[in-house]
């Protein structure tokens, strides 16, 4: 309990920690642009007026809105980190830990966006008072980084843990192909180094799964409600089975995604795609049709500026024999 009544409630929640305040600002900015504009100077250190503890969004938010917000890296704002040298050639919105570093005697920091690679698990809680508790509470849950996981539904009445979440076969030093945590990490760690090149392939699978779960929700809950009116135990069993099924189906899809990515982007080249979304097979031999995208133009220009004529192609001088 704070005994100093002169302090505001927000002060109790450790104001002025830049790493955390920027994340709060980003949420505010996404859901109320006017508030975001007002407090940008505070985040940039140009104003001493702190942000409020909470705000009213400019519109009603959906579960999908909040899921998208959990994946934010300040893209499209003055805090965007995809356009400085730390992003590398493929504009990764991630920075390696630790949060701070020194050059000489001066200390600097890395931005800490809402979505970070070291996340263990993430969720969006959906609570609806107009439904029985067993049906009205859903935890949209994913393991690892929110940006590159799948938010699958776990109903609050569930009394069984999906095998892929259980940790039976894996821990922090033991990889398992049956572990959601390790499968999501496996795919994410492939994508981050070539983020702008590979992220769209991941996003297509992610959106398909999450759209499927969202579109199925009303029907699933209608069926659960019919069961609940007759036998609440059967309704809870039904929703538990559904929660386990969606978690496992997401992991099955993610394994296939990982297999697809390692083939398509093998060794820095990109294999060509057929109209049906499969990788083109070679007509003869063992080399599939591919392109070599190399590095982006902007990166190459900066490379030449930094290295001068170090990599300039020239003919080696050969003495006459």
Descriptions of predicted regions:
Residues 2-13, 317-321:
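Single conserved hydrophobic/aromatic residue that forms the stacking wall/gate
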Residues 54-133:
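Extended, compositionally biased non-globular segments
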Residues 15, 50, 61-63, 144, ...:
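Helix N-terminus capping/helix-initiation residues
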Residues 101-215:
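Substrate-recognition/cap regions that form aromatic- and gly/pro-loop-enriched pockets
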Residues 205-319:
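Histidine-centered catalytic/metal-binding microenvironments
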Residues 11-31, 35, 39:
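Long, charge-rich alpha-helical interaction segments
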Residues 1, 5-7, 41, 89, ...:
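A compositional/structural signature marking long, glycine- and acidic/polar-rich segments
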Residues 47-55:
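Axial heme c-ligation environment in periplasmic c-type cytochrome domains
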